[in-house]
């Protein structure tokens, strides 16, 4: 029985391993592999139960480590902390590994300084552990680019010095040798060379590429590009290296070489991440041929959307009939349009509904529940005077009967919508007439939690907006729904009145100008044809166009302001508001 368990586990057939193990849970080895297989299959509650049973039967440090891992996977962090600290008191052969797990737990829970202390102590005891150094350097990788860069530079300096010491014979590995003959000396020299090569490979393929990316995130673009360029020969088979290099080239407006770098990454690993990064580049360019190629790659986003996608089966069915018959496949059919991405994408791509309404017999549109009332009311208003959406029905729940289903963001692909056609299509949201306010009302929105720790930073501080609006004869109205902030009595807080997107729409009806970050409310404001200033950080999303010349192809009237320096940006924003 155990041989079967071992066989299936080490051949990565965790389902079969779990199935066999669960028939013999009285055997401690079977129980161990049942727990490990459950972890591999992300059946976390089952993994925790088995880990607890293991620890009851055999309270070793190893089983304690397994239990702590199960606690972490089930977000039981306090239990994990308590267990790991208890295990440390044993001071046994797994002392280092328990510390590593504790450091990982500190990282997960945001206690990065505590994690840093553990790694520093471990490195004092074992300064030549390459993987330990890598983990240490990566502590702040997503949270503090300056600290992360400093750690990478510390690592590089240490290992460069180590290499020099080995070359000079000042540092010699312990080598078992009974004689001092020529053959042994030759073998020792060969081992030294292998060690040097190993260190250099570690730096050139694992550490320096990360340093180059950190330089990019800190906007030290020339340094980043120079370092990436110098590392190419060592990373010919490293797909992630080429993906990150492509991002820096793209930001530097070197779009052709960025395209080649993304293609290089794809040639090494045909992963969805590389495909939709390439899609973003192509769609950012704003030319018809690039947009057409980008649409195809953009479909790869659904690889990561299985949990949000209504049905992979129905999407694949739609793709198959489209590949066979093209757009004609949807003529006189009942088509379900579902939404698998954010609110902003739903609003932005909703103008593409007009095209499918021209082709299909009936369109069943199922927006996110928070948007249902808004779209239902808007379609009702529009259908009183227009025919564009007469065959469209807004649904609160997903239907059981339809011919084909497709995501709203896939409409440009399935409906063969050209780039120049997009802005001509009508958004199913009725535009507001310009308000007649004696004192202009300025709406503001500056923060979204979705932008925290994301690849593209979008948020600004409230004070930045207030500085730009200071001493201006306008009434400021906040639409900020989330975040830790305090508004002065001079600012009206309309967020208190908002429960869904229909409320948001209604509360925008008297706004003269909306100042917002890249967010869903930006798209809604633009759909309502409210003069809208979209504030962007230097690295921004593809939908706002080229880095050196931002322009929205979905919203041509958007006033886009890229803020590179906040003091200068506040001055530019102040001037831009006065023109609206």
Task: List where the protein language model places each region.
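Alpha-helical solenoid repeat scaffolds of the TPR/TPR-like class and their adjacent stem/linker regions
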Residues: 1-513, 518-580
């Amino acid at each position: 029985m155990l041989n079967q368990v071992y066989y299936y586990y080490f051949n990565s057939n965790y389902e079969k391993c779990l199935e066999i193990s669960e028939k013999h849970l009285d055997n401690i080895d079977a129980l161990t592999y049942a727990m490990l297989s459950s972890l591999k299959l992300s059946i976390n509650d089952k993994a925790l139960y088995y880990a607890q049973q293991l620890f009851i039967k055999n309270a070793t440090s190893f089983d304690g480590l397994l239990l702590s891992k199960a606690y972490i996977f089930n977000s039981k962090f306090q239990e994990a902390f308590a267990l790991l600290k208890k295990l440390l008191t044993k001071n046994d052969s797994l002392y280092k590994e328990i510390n590593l797990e504790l450091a990982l737990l500190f990282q997960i829970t945001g206690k990065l300084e505590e994690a840093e202390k553990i790694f520093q102590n471990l490195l004092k005891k074992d300064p030549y552990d390459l993987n330990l150094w890598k983990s240490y350097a990566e502590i702040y990788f997503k949270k503090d680019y300056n600290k992360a860069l400093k750690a990478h530079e510390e690592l590089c300096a240490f290992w460069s010095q180590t290499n020099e010491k080995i070359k000079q014979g000042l540092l010699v590995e312990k080598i078992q040798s009974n004689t001092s003959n020529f053959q042994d000396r030759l073998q020792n020299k060969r081992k030294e060379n292998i060690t040097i090569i190993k260190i250099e490979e570690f730096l050139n393929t694992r550490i320096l590429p990360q340093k180059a990316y950190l330089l990019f995130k800190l906007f030290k673009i020339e340094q980043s590009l120079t370092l990436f360029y110098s590392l190419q020969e060592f990373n010919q088979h490293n797909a992630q290296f080429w993906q990150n290099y492509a991002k820096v080239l793209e930001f530097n407006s070197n779009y052709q070489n960025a395209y080649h770098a993304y293609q290089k990454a794809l040639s090494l690993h045909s992963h969805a991440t590389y495909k939709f990064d390439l899609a973003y580049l192509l769609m950012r360019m704003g030319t018809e041929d690039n947009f057409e190629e980008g649409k195809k790659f953009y479909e790869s986003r659904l690889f990561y959307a299985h949990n949000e996608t209504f049905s992979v089966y129905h999407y694949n069915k739609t793709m198959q009939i489209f590949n066979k018959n093209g757009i004609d496949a949807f003529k006189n059919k009942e088509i379900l349009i579902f939404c698998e991405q954010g609110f902003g994408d739903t609003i932005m791509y909703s103008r593409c509904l007009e095209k499918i309404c021209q082709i299909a017999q009936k369109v069943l549109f199922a927006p996110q529940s928070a948007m249902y009332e808004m779209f239902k009311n808007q379609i009702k208003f529009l259908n009183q005077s227009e025919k564009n959406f007469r065959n469209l029905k807004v649904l609160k729940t997903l239907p059981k009967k339809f011919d084909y289903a497709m995501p709203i963001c896939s409409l440009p692909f399935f409906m063969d919508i050209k780039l120049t056609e997009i802005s001509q299509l009508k958004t199913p949201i009725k535009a507001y007439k310009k308000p007649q306010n004696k004192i202009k009302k300025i709406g503001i929105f500056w923060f979204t939690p979705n932008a925290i720790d994301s690849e593209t930073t979008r948020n600004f501080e409230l004070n930045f907006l207030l500085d730009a609006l200071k001493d201006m004869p306008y009434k400021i109205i906040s639409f900020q729904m989330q975040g830790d902030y305090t508004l002065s009595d001079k600012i009206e807080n309309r967020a208190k009145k908002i429960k869904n997107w229909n409320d948001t729409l209604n509360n925008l009806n008297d706004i003269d100008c909306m100042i917002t970050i890249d967010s869903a409310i930006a798209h809604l404001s633009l759909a309502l044809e409210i003069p809208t200033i979209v504030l962007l950080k230097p690295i921004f999303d593809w939908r706002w166009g080229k880095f050196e010349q931002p322009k929205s192809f979905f919203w041509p009237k958007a006033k886009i302001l890229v803020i590179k320096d906040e003091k200068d940006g506040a001055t530019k924003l102040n001037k831009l508001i006065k023109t609206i």
